[in-house]
Amino acid sequence: MGISLDNGIRISLSDIFEGDQEHAFATTLHPDGRHEIVDVEPLAEGSTSIWNSATTGRRYPTKWVVSIPMLKARLCVEPFVREQEVVSPIGEHKYEGASSVIGQMQGEPVTGHAIVELVGDWN
């Protein structure tokens, strides 16, 4: 998930599964050029609003609450349109959702936009 906030902060989120282990982290780029890698609460736990693809039968979450404790951030990510699956005739189908972001960071309201990419089985 890539997030661009109106306060100038850019966030790249990763949520990786290895067996039954989930590893979530974010790389942040601040307007002054500072770069940080910080822990994120697991994204799968904050995902809701499951959309079922009529084309592939895949299920994808389409709303997320992103919590980044070190940045004192809680961001709600929701797609502009739910149906944003990329169907591949030769490979893995995936969800690439252009989304809006609204929330709080460091006690201040923030808004922005995001692109969400989901690969794999979300059943």
What residues fall within each predicted segment?
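Structured soluble/peripheral alpha/beta segments that form catalytic or ligand/cofactor-binding pockets
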Residues: 1-123
